[in-house]
From Swiss-Prot:
The keyword Signal applies. The lineage of its organism: Eukaryota, Metazoa, Spiralia, Lophotrochozoa, Mollusca. Expressed by the venom duct. It comes from Conus victoriae (Queen Victoria cone). Disulfide bonds join C48-C62, C55-C66, C61-C71. Residues 20-44 form a propeptide. One of its GO terms (molecular function) is ion channel inhibitor activity. This is Conotoxin Vc6.17.
Length: 73
């Protein structure tokens, strides 16, 4: 009987440890996606000039389709 209780306790500890590692991996994936988004925004700011853009989505209007401060694409 004691062996069964010990086995159940060990199983519970292993399951909770696995859940903790899964949560850690999930957070790491979220952090990586957030970093990629931040890197993309930094690249956009580097490639795209600061100007008042009449376009509805200023993120799409970058230096290669910008003419005299207005989006052409």
């Amino acid at each position: 009987m004691q062996k069964l209780i010990i086995l159940l306790l060990v199983a519970a500890v292993l399951m909770s440890t696995q859940a903790l590692f899964q949560e850690k991996r999930r957070k790491e994936k979220i952090d990586l996606l957030s970093k990629r988004k931040t890197d993309a925004e930094k690249q956009h700011k580097r490639l795209c000039p600061d100007y008042t853009d009449p376009c509805s989505n200023a993120y799409e209007c970058c230096s290669w389709n910008c003419h005299n401060g207005h989006c052409t694409g």
